[in-house]
């Protein structure tokens, strides 16, 4: 009987990428296949996030729920990976003794060996070391699932923002060799991938030798240009970037590389210089706005998303008003916004915080409502326009429809004969937007690129 692995992912797209790699590693070494049901699994893995306290506690809550599965099946392997694992280490086993494996983001490639040692010794295995970029040398070829794919180009972060635990859980910035990244993407393109998202905690800090042993360094802008030259790749996205390292060379890339989408996720975190300084972000609001102005001079239709932290220690009403002024000026398409959550071991955790939680919650609700209004306004403005999308899959709610994403990352559902689905998935098509919903769009198929004009009957 085929053995199965269940992976639950918390947090960012880096974790989503790592979860896919866990499945790939165990599939290649152990023959495991992915399941969406923990009750059917022989291996259960939690890929964790420690950016916010709520996500961290959710992990232990979920561990408690699978404990009875372990009691019913002592051969079941339960593992905890990701940033909580890096932060807590063996303390996870002390708190939940039924956990068999604890591994960090840099050691997921060692999962098969850790499982073997657990079975041989009967003892929990903990490996949260930082072997830099070693894991990429031990990962099997990626298994393609659709025309879009994530590709990790670097690991770690060296910015040490005062509130952030990532440098302590993922280590310092280390870039993958240029050849490795391009080889992986070329392999994905050969398997039908048309769109890649380049991943890193701070992708625009990417620096790598042009070739093995080369003293000539390729930066992130140059990497994008190389990726654009790979046959079959039609769209390039990336996340996450840092305003401090948004160079003029990277800005110029938006003029030189049409395949680079007109959508940017650029976390600002706050709209007050005083708070940004306390956060140790390394830029001012004016410097952030200058980057956006330069980009929109090249791409007037550039859509912008961001991250915002409300209620950072010392935040006044004036500080929050400055944040809202920035939101109105930048016209953000989306914002991942949260109330500040102090993380143990970070400098900000020692700052005095005298703002009542109800005030923070009210500010967050105001921010999110304003962003939602802007999202709807942008969606409404797209009605009647022709948008080029990459068809990714059948629509989730209606099997007679297909779904894809616009350049500004909106999901578009459109009707198409079922007989045409296999042909259209993976194609770039033009759709006319006919209706805007809060979090998606509805369209009508107009044209299939590199193909005959589409028909809907």
From Swiss-Prot:
Where would you find the membrane-spanning parts of this chain? Answer: none
| Residues engaged in binding [4Fe-4S] cluster 2 | 157, 161, 164
MTTase N-terminal domain ranges (all copies): 3-120
Q: Report the enzyme's class at the first EC level.
A: transferase
Q: Which Pfam families match?
A: Radical_SAM, TRAM, UPF0004
Q: What is its EC number?
A: 2.8.4.3
Note accompanying the cofactor annotation: Binds 2 [4Fe-4S] clusters. One cluster is coordinated with 3 cysteines and an exchangeable S-adenosyl-L-methionine.
Family designation: Belongs to the methylthiotransferase family. MiaB subfamily.
Complex and partners: Monomer.
The protein here is known as tRNA-2-methylthio-N(6)-dimethylallyladenosine synthase
Species, as recorded: Paraburkholderia phytofirmans (strain DSM 17436 / LMG 22146 / PsJN)
């Amino acid at each position: 009987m085929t053995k199965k692995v269940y992976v639950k992912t918390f947090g960012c797209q880096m974790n989503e990428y790592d979860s896919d790699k866990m499945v790939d590693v165990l599939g290649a070494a152990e023959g495991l296949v992915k399941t969406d049901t923990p009750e059917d699994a022989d291996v259960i893995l939690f890929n964790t996030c420690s950016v916010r306290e709520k996500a961290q506690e959710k992990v232990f809550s979920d561990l408690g729920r699978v404990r009875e599965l372990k009691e019913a099946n002592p051969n079941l392997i339960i593992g905890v990976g990701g940033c909580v694992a890096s932060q807590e280490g063996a303390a996870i086993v002390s708190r939940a003794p039924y956990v068999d494996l604890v591994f960090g983001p840099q050691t997921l490639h060692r999962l098969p060996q850790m499982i073997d040692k657990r079975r041989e010794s009967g003892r929990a295995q903990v490996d949260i070391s930082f072997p830099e970029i070693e894991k990429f040398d031990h990962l099997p070829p990626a298994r393609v699932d659709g025309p879009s794919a994530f590709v990790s180009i670097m690991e770690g972060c060296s910015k040490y923002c005062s509130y952030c635990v990532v440098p302590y859980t993922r280590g310092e910035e280390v870039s993958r060799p240029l050849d490795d990244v391009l080889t992986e993407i070329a392999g994905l393109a050969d398997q039908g991938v048309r769109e890649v998202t380049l991943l890193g905690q701070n992708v625009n800090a990417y620096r790598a030798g042009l070739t093995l042993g080369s003293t000539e360094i390729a930066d992130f802008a140059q990497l994008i240009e190389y990726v654009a030259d790979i046959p079959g790749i039609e769209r390039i996205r990336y996340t996450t970037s840092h305003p401090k390292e948004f160079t003029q060379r990277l800005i110029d890339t938006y003029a030189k590389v049409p395949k680079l989408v007109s959508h940017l996720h650029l976390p600002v975190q706050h709209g007050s210089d005083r708070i940004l300084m306390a956060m140790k972000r390394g830029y001012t609001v004016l410097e952030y706005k200058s980057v956006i102005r330069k980009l929109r001079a090249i791409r007037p239709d550039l859509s912008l998303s961001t991250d915002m932290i409300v209620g950072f220690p010392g935040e006044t009403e004036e500080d929050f008003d400055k944040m809202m002024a920035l939101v109105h000026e930048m016209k953000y398409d989306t914002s991942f916004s949260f109330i500040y959550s102090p993380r143990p071991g970070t400098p900000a955790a020692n700052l005095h915080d005298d703002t009542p939680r109800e005030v923070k919650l009210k500010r967050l609700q105001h921010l999110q409502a304003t962003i939602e209004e802007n999202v709807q306004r942008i969606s409404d403005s797209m009605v009647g326009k022709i948008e080029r999308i990459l068809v990714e899959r059948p629509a989730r709610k209606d099997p007679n429809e297909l779904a894809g994403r616009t350049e500004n990352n909106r999901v578009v559902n459109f009707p198409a004969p079922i007989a045409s689905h296999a042909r259209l998935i993976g194609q770039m098509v033009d759709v006319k937007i006919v209706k805007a919903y809060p979090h998606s769009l509805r369209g009508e198929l107009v044209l299939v690129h590199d193909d005959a004009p589409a028909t809907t009957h």
